[in-house]
Amino acid sequence: MEKSSETNGYLDSAQEGPAAGPGEPGTTARRAGRCAGFLRRHGLVLLTVSGVVAGAGLGAALRGLQLNRTQVTYLAFPGEMLLRMLRMIILPLVVCSLVSGAASLDASSLGRLGGIAIAYFGLTTLGASALAVALAFIIKPGSGSQTLQSSDLGLEDSGPPPVPKETVDSFLDLTRNLFPSNLVVAAFRTYATDYREVTYNTSAGKVTIEKIPIGTEIEGMNILGLVLFALVLGVALKKLGSEGEELIRFFNAFNEATMVLVSWIMWYVPVGIMFLVGSKIVEMKDIIMLVTSLGKYIFTSILGHFIHGGIVLPLIYFVFTRKNPFRFLLGLLTPFATAFATCSSSATLPSMMKCIEENNGVDKRISRFILPIGATVNMDGAAIFQCVAAVFIAQLNNVELRAGQIFTILVTATASSVGAAGVPAGGVLTIAIILEAIGLPTHDLSLILAVDWIVDRTTTVVNVEGDALGAGILHHLNQKAMKRGEQELSEVKVEAIPNSKSEEETSPLVTHPNPTGPAASTPESKESVL
């Protein structure tokens, strides 16, 4: 009897008789086919990584030409087009994916998966903050740098540090953004509290200055409000039943069409990344001075990202799934390269959705439900960078942090990182909130701004890695729950098989199909134990 031919190229040679020689046409054709298949599956990954390397080489080669600001802007134009295309697709992708994802899950699954996701995001961010504080106390990045000034770095054009906000106002802004007053405005503007100083002259001749909070709208998508609205809308459509099916199908079709657009944009990613990285390297005035002056701070932040992203998060994934986390991460090289080049979790969301579904087989209902939420609220890398920066500034000012202040850093970094998405200089603004909470000056934030472009790249990679591994864990737990449900259902069916006529007569709630065949015509004979 002939065996069916396998499609695996390694098995074909064993079944087709004697092995062909290295120069024979059969072996060459098979090798060419395998190479073509490999390039077809991993071509985009190879091109994206090559774009990062080529961008670094391009920037290093052009630094000697002393390009002016206008020429650097022209050089960055292809990269700017990539960012604009990715940001263009974020709004329909987030809204449609969350509506279709929430509508495709039943209420119990939605609550269970949502609870697991919130616990995962909160605990990993808190763990990242604790790791960062521990590393900062061990390495002491601020020791010996007390005389360092931002003017020494040649980066006066990095802009002034953001005006610090009161901690209470920051959390109130977070709540306000969860419930936008206008969904159209929320697509491109975010609520933020500003301050106006009012001077009062008292009767005693004293001058009193009062800082009054004023509500303003700043540029940037209010992703928090859109996420909450899309989730609630999906649940509401699910509750409507048959009346909401038409609208659910509309959002599903809109989501699929958006993913097609994403697949087209992804082929432009290598070109855009090359010019983004190259222009940023050309733009820096003195990289060597920057690294040597703030080297310990940069090293501490990147080391924290490496430990959390390379050890802690993969270990959590392995504990829950018992699978190789690095094989899972290998299918996400394109989103990681995009995150490294764009420094934006939201801009990486389209490529992350595409790769995690196609390369890693994560259920679309899981990925399209959890990834938009993770891109908004899960900021492990940002928490590490913010906690290291807070301890660094405390050491610069010779301030010994007490236990209460350390606890405040951990809680504030974990909570305020949720609202950092969509806000310009959001990470540095969060550091200002932390410094205000523990009573430290904010004038040294310009040093953090000077190296933000370096640290922010590994920060974004760790952020999106945490989202992806969280989606993988939820996918595994959901598959496990489904198998358990099928097993329980099969056990119920086995127990419902009638064993005697009396069981059928005394079980009016269980109906059985009429048996057919010879077994049905003869009664079941049983041995009497008497």
Curated annotation (Swiss-Prot):
Topology in membrane: Multi-pass membrane protein
Post-translational modification Phosphoserine, affected residues: S507, S525, S528
Cellular component, GO annotation: melanosome; plasma membrane
Record field: transmembrane: 42-62, 88-108, 119-139, 217-237, 257-277, 298-318, 328-348, 373-393, 418-438
Cell compartment(s), UniProt: Membrane; Melanosome
Cytoplasmic side stretches: 1-41
Main location: membrane
Name this protein carries in UniProt: Neutral amino acid transporter A
Organism: Bos taurus (Bovine)
